[in-house]
Amino acid sequence: MPTRKSRLFPDLKPQNEHERFMLEAIKEAEKAIDKNECPIGCVIVKDGRVFVRAHNLRLTKGNAICHAEVTAIDKACRKMGDFRLNDCDMYVTLEPCTMCAGAIIQSRIRKVYFGAYEPKSGAVCSCNDIFNVIHGHNHKVEYEGGLLEEQCAAMMKDFFKNIRIRDSKKD
């Protein structure tokens, strides 16, 4: 069954299953853009299918923890009736922050695939290495970064460029 195309990247054709799922996360990020939210999208995959979708909702909900990853984990746990998501993988457009990395560990996500690296606050490998430094948990999260990195980074860059342009017009 064909899915709708990305609005920002209509010619993007996924080369494999991982790119296909990241494209779904990109579509979620586009929903965030429509709400003037930071363009971060996330999908959790279970049994080779998208299980839940989420995007940033911090401004919309007025809640600092409504990051795409935390919202997706919450949806998946409610849908499964369990906090253990060990047979699930996460695809997110930006390297998770410390809070989200902690939630990923606690929910026992099997593997995280992220798009753009986050040099200012990325907690998977850019600024911190949360998946490898938190001890005392019986779960180790695997990860792979840089999946459709160019597109994911472009969304972030364009979003913040547009904010600067908008803010400069206020002066």
Predicted regions, residues:
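Zinc-dependent deaminase
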Residues: 1-33, 99-171
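Residues at secondary-structure transition points
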Residues: 12, 16, 38, 59-67, ...
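Small-residue (primarily alanine) positions within well-ordered alpha-helices
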Residues: 25, 29-32, 42, 52, ...
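Short beta-strand scaffold segments in enzyme catalytic cores
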Residues: 40-48
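Helix-adjacent hinge/juxtasegments
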Residues: 62, 66, 70-107
